[in-house]
Design a protein with these regions (language model features):
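Flexible, glycine/charged-enriched surface loops at secondary-structure junctions
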Residues: 16-22, 68, 125-129, 203-223, ...
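N-terminal glycine-rich flavin-associated loop
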Residues: 9, 33-65, 83-129, 145-197, ...
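A glycine-rich phosphate-binding loop feature that marks nucleotide/adenosyl-phosphate handling sites
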Residues: 26, 73-76, 131-138, 222-225, ...
């Protein structure tokens, strides 16, 4: 059956979008849940027609199939052991409605990106899950994911306008299009009749209809969404809204149109501390009753004074070292808190409260009402609202930091589980206390409870081991007791936000009752009569399915002792590259495979993502350590070489969106180092290069000169053809963007510039303003490309700019022999990297007169490396240096000509991207910061050896360049600029060139 399915599938799709190998099925089969199933086939789909035909093939061969977008769901709804269809990064189209009150979205666009699109219009995307920075629209809608503000009034179900879906027979239905509806009426009359019959049946049962309305008055995503059956008359509206919360069990969502809401201009927050959890919940109930004016409904779907109230229990506060909690502990131990014994801190509970106003006056009125409401409760300290984003931003950072903080402190090898329940708001004070006690009674003493108290919705985090049957049984018993408390005690929701998945599938009927469950089964049968869509999710008749297929999290335990340490070469050995790399890899054991990293992993979608690399490495090490299945271990290790190692840009941007700040690039560096330990010849080549840098630079200049002559002689077309053929044979790829050689700077350069520009200068006069300039070995070797619009290479431009601003340039001694060490670090020779860094450090220390003068490096990746190991000097790349030292010494004359800038990954990591943008805007009134372009993927030399990585990283750039009619771009890394030019067809240069042509000396 599988072989025939694959045979038919390969007639439909190219092989490079069908994965059946051990490595990619394992990688793509990994999601954020604590379940693991490995798909037999992973399919990367690019369009509706493809999806339609794939679904028909699955029907033909009776192959169960699961759809997936970002894979950030938590309940096991995006994993399968059959066919996995990925609709992610190629499904990102959108269309804003005429009045900006709606937006049409494909499923692969990230939620936070939607808010970026809407921001200029003062609108927001209503659903706001905590994963919005990584979760995609398809998953947000199909799981009915919500968060801190949207509640039940602005979730996907309430905000959906229409949907475009693909049914199990391959039919494409657009519920917003009358022609599509008409065609569907003709082709699927029985389908519509069954929907209408189920609607009427449910409504005729007043008890059931009433129960459905009551259940959805609080957050509830347990089971299929029954609300459409009582909320909408039109069968097409019922079909569309049934998709919300269906978790891929009914159809494929290819497009959705959602309402947008106004974003309030005025906001204020307060962290309110209560002495008991019960009283904090009573305050929430009281605040929930406070109504705002009707004008609020023009901005929000609900007119309440308080817009959100997030509860944080004492363990949550402890996990983030909340300063008020720390003071409370001192007061308790000092006997200052009445009726509380020393050492008993569990009473303190915080409610993070937010209110918003259309006008500032309205905001102040709301704050006064909230303060009046809080006055009836006993607080630990007085509540203080702040309108300062910098202050309340810290409050929300505390709230957002709970999950990573708890997850980051869990014992290695355990899973971090986030459970998700909701109670009716009036039951909150009593139910919350009981939930806290229940969790403690089962031995989860480090668990914390936090969440959306305003919606009666709590998350509790458990550090859970699945290493033995006893631990699994403990978890199962606890979950059954939670179910009993929620369902029998308060008729609440066993899943409020995170989806039913496999985790809560055995409890759906228990929560809803027989009649509602039968209605869900009927709805499922109408859409998916053969039960092929996401089998085992929502509907699962194995009562123990929630404790099966549990994901192992084996320890990443490498031979760290074999990593050579070159830290002793450095002025400060504690900044050793080996030590930092090992620490980062050990931190990777905290990875919970949530997938938040993937939005910033540029190889995600081409080969593997950061999350997948960790998951695969865990499997390899586990198999090798246990001796289980050595053939599979060997296969995974072999396949990992290209997909995991060679196509990892190792840029570290994954850490910027990782809750645990894990840098998977360092894992790649370690793997390369361990591989290099087994390659004596490779190490000898590295040693030779380190000891003969001057000769190698000279040799490279000769190579560049020969390549330039060949380019001129053969022409770009023939030269490109020849070089692409050689690249397929393993040679680095030459492109038309390749630079000419760069000659070394001479003293006469400055003199010649002064003569040309008629700048007053007296021989022998030295400026008090000095800068040590290390161009980097790249900029010492590589000049401009053939098509560059300037005649001076970067080194000359820097000298000229410094003279214009009155700065004297100091070059470090022996510069031709110097390198920052980045090349060796990226190749996995960490000790040599530190040795080269130390040589440069000593030269810069001397040239800067022991740190007296700032140091400028012309290459941002090199500076990033230098900053990691050289802490005693002030180090800058061009943009930050110019904004810090030169801006006030120059007159800027901005051009109206459009330009593009590329923010390199190292620029982002150093936090100087804002300087790059600000500087560009001083020089041009028309600056393009391309959307959807992060790391370019050139990654040192990867753009030469694996050009597909560079092409993929920049796949969204050229259309934007052409649309905006841009003729030149700027950055701050020569190697990145080569790749940018090769993939856009326009020259890219260092931003120093732009500053030079846009400025004159200050008058």
């Amino acid at each position: 059956m599988l072989d025939q399915f694959l045979s038919d599938l390969k007639q439909l799709l190219p092989n490079d979008r069908i994965y059946t190998d051990e490595l990619r099925t394992l990688g793509w089969g990994t999601d954020a849940s604590f379940y693991r199933q490995i798909p037999k086939v992973v399919i990367r789909s690019d369009g509706e027609e493809e999806i339609s035909k794939i679904i028909q093939l699955c029907q033909k061969h009776k192959m169960p199939l699961t759809f997936r977008a970002a894979g950030t769901s938590l309940s096991g709804q995006s994993c399968t052991d059959s066919v996995l269809i990925v609709a992610g990064k190629h499904w990102e189209k959108y269309e804003i409605g005429k009045n900006q009150d709606t937006i049409k979205l494909q499923p692969g666009i990230v939620g936070a990106r939607v808010n970026e699109i809407l921001k200029p219009y003062g609108r927001v995307f209503p659903p706001d899950p905590a994963s919005i920075g990584s979760a995609m629209v398809g998953g947000i809608v199909i799981n009915n994911a919500s968060g801190m503000n949207c509640g039940v009034h602005a979730n996907s179900d309430r905000m959906m306008v229409s949907a475009r879906i693909i049914l199990t027979d391959g039919t494409i239905l657009d519920t917003s299009n009358e022609e599509s509806r008409r065609a569907f009426r003709q082709s699927h009359p029985e389908f519509l009749e069954k929907i209408e019959a189920l609607r009427d049946k449910v409504r005729a049962n007043e008890k059931l209809a009433s129960r459905i309305r009551t259940k959805y008055s609080i957050k509830n995503v347990t089971g299929l969404n029954l609300r459409p059956l009582v909320a909408y008359d039109d069968p097409f509206d019922i079909i569309a809204h049934s998709m919300v919360g269906s978790e891929g069990t009914l159809a494929f969502l290819s497009e959705v149109t959602m309402k947008t809401l106004h974003d309030y201009k005025y906001k204020a927050s307060a962290m309110v501390y209560f002495l008991t959890m019960k009283e904090s919940c009573e305050a929430v109930v009281a605040m929930k009753k406070m109504k705002a004016g009707e004008d609020d409904l023009t901005y929000s779907a609900e007119n309440l004074v308080v817009k959100s109230a997030e509860m944080l229990d004492y363990m949550s506060l402890a996990s983030v070292d909340d300063p008020v909690y720390l003071q409370y502990k001192k007061d308790v131990d000092a006997g200052k808190i009445p009726d509380v014994k020393p050492g008993d801190y569990k009473g303190l509970t915080a409610i993070l409260t937010e209110t918003k106003g259309i006008t500032h006056e309205q905001l102040l009125e709301k704050i006064a009402k909230i303060q009046d409401c809080l006055s009836q409760f006993k607080l630990y300290i007085p509540a203080e609202f702040t309108e300062d984003p910098a202050v309340y931003g810290k409050y929300w950072a505390i709230r957002s930091g709970i999950f990573p903080s708890v997850g980051g402190t869990r014992p290695i090898g355990t899973s971090c589980l986030i459970e998700d329940v909701a109670f009716p708001i009036e039951s909150l004070p009593e139910a919350t206390v009981k939930l806290q006690k229940l969790i403690a009674d089962h031995g989860y003493n480090d668990a914390c409870i936090y969440g959306h108290a305003f919606e009666g919705n709590y998350h509790f985090i458990l550090n859970q081991s699945f290493a033995d049957e006893h631990e699994v049984a403990r978890y199962a018993e606890m979950m059954r007791d939670v179910a009993k408390l929620v369902v029998e005690g308060y008729d609440g929701s066993l899943k409020a936000e995170h989806g039913t998945g496999r985790n809560m599938a055995p409890f759906v009927q228990y929560e809803w009752g027989d009649e509602a469950y039968e209605a869900m089964k009927e709805l499922k049968a109408i859409f998916d009569p053969d039960n092929l869509l996401n089998r085992g999710v929502i509907f699962n008749y194995d009562p123990d399915c929630f404790i099966k297929d549990l994901k192992p999290l084996p320890v990443l335990d490498y031979d760290f002792a074999s990593v050579p340490d070159g830290g002793h070469y450095l002025m400060e050995p504690e900044h050793s590259t080996a030590k930092e790399t090992i620490e980062q890899v050990k931190r990777a054991n905290k990875c919970i495979e949530c997938g938040f990293c993937e939005v910033n992993c540029m190889s995600c979608g081409l080969t593997l993502s950061s999350r997948m690399r960790i998951a695969v490495q865990r499997e390899i090490l586990y198999l090798e350590k246990t001796g289980q299945n050595p053939e599979r271990a060997a296969t995974l290790r072999k396949q990992y070489k290209y997909y995991g190692d060679q196509t990892c840009a190792a840029d570290g941007l994954c850490s910027t969106s990782c809750p645990m700040k894990i840098n998977t690039g360092e894992l790649t560096h370690l793997i390369r180092q361990l591989d290099m330990n087994k390659n004596p010849m490779g190490y000898k080549v590295g040693e030779f290069a380190a000891n003969h840098m001057a000769g190698i630079k000279s040799g490279l200049r000769v190579v560049l000169d020969v390549a330039h002559v060949a380019h001129v002689t053969l022409g770009p077309t023939l030269m490109t053809t020849v070089c692409r053929t050689m690249n397929k044979m393993g040679m680095p790829l030459w492109t038309t963007a390749m630079p000419k050689k760069k000659r070394q700077p001479k003293k006469s350069d400055l003199t010649q510039f002064i003569i040309e520009k008629s700048i007053p200068h007296h021989e022998g006069q030295h400026s008090d303003l000095k800068v040590v300039y290390f161009p980097s070995c790249i900029n010492q070797t590589m000049g401009l490309s053939k098509e560059a619009p300037f005649k001076h290479a970067l080194v000359d431009e820097v000298i000229q700019l410094m003279a214009k601003a009155g700065y004297e340039v100091i070059f470090p001694e022996g510069m031709e022999r110097m390198c920052c060490g980045q090349i060796w670090e990226s190749k996995g020779m960490l000790d040599i990297a530190d040795r080269k860094s130390a040589e440069l450090e000593a030269a810069l220390w001397k040239a800067s007169e022991q740190g007296k003068y700032p140091v400028l490096c012309g290459q941002s990746p090199c500076l990033h490396r230098m900053k990691k190991v050289m802490k005693k000097m002030k180090l800058y790349e061009p943009a930050e240096f110019i904004m810090t030292y030169l801006k006030d010494r120059l007159d800027f004359h901005p051009t109206d000509k459009p330009i593009a800038i590329h923010i390199t990954c190292s620029t982002r990591q150093m936090g100087v991207d804002k300087d790059m943008i600000a500087l560009a805007k001083l020089c041009s009134n028309n600056v393009l910061i391309p959307e959807g372009v992060g790391c370019c993927g050139f990654a040192g030399d990867r753009g030469f050896t694996f050009p597909e990585l560079n092409r993929y990283g920049l796949r969204k750039l050229k259309p934007q360049i052409e649309k905006n009619k841009i003729e030149v771009g700027y950055s701050n890394s020569r190697t990145c600029e080569i790749g940018l030019e090769a993939n856009t067809g326009i020259p890219y240069l260092n931003i120093v060139h732009l500053v030079n042509i846009s400025t004159t000396a200050k008058k």
